[in-house]
Amino acid sequence: DEINRATPKTQSALLEAMQEHTVTVGNDSHKLEEPFFVLATQNPIENEGTYPLPEAQLDRFMFKILVEFPSKEELKGIVMLTEGANAPVIEKKMDGEGLLAARALVNQIPIADAVMDYLLDIVMETHVDNTYIKEGASPRAAQALIRGAKAKAFLDGRFNVSSKSYLF
């Protein structure tokens, strides 16, 4: 929670975990069990007591989702769901093995050359001279875009990547 409040030393340790799937304590390295992935929040409002996230760390996140403040009706729904006797009980829907199996299925979803080229063109366009883009998308970003399109196809019950897979 609020990853930008982590000290640079903690961020460095998290970067090691994200890149190498290991953590080091003293001189001992420990392999992290699969599936391992990081979900993080960032407080976009308050900057006091925060540390900037290094580009190398930001590049390892597949997506950044900006969550807007909910409407009054949405806020009411949130409050009604989370406060009082009707608060939902969180149920386990899948274990680690199931998640790894789903990941393997997603990886097998084919992507046509034309679709691949279109998605790579999007990434390449971030590298043209543009005053609005500070740094272009990395090769990891291209991989994440392809992986995200495959995952969307999988979640939609489709067995190939189409324009419906990347028009989020």
What label would you give each PLM region?
Residues I3, S29-H30, S165:
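Proline- and acidic/polar-enriched loop/turn elements at helix boundaries
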Residues T82-F168:
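Basic, amphipathic alpha-helical bundle interface domains used for macromolecular binding and assembly
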